[in-house]
Amino acid sequence: MKKILVIHNKYRETGGEDIAVSNEIKLLEQKFKVKVLYFDNNISNLFLQSFYFATNRNKKSINLLKQLIDDFNPDIVYVHNTWFKASLGIFELLKNKNIKVILKLHNFRYFCTKSYFSKNHVLVDNVCEACGYKGSKRILNKYFNNSIAKSLLISRYGVKYFQI
């Protein structure tokens, strides 16, 4: 029986993506041996979490995943949300372990990060077709939490996400 490791970073408030992941896990368990690695974005050390977020690598998450891979030895890793505690650093580990990866894109949040720092982020009607953001045609939009600094970090995350 094939083994699948599901990775999902839960949202602070349960929403559609979390429910979809839960439903898919139930479906997969009917045909495969499944383990689930959940992450959450509770912050215990603000400085350390900020560092992990800025570097797109969470050493604690990577080590947790490495241990689970060594114990479970999955054939496939099915990745849902990595924002932000799971981190993009998990993909380097998965590549080095030569494990097949399925990456599910639930929404287009990262697509719009490719452009939201430009005045082209919002079109003629001032609404981004990818995220629904309504704003002005400025050079820098405060897209994420009304903060240029946070917007810059998520933009960097989005660019790296599409390099995977």
Segments and roles (model prediction):
Residues 1-164:
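Catalytic cores of nucleotide-sugar-dependent glycosyltransferases that transfer UDP/GDP/TDP-activated
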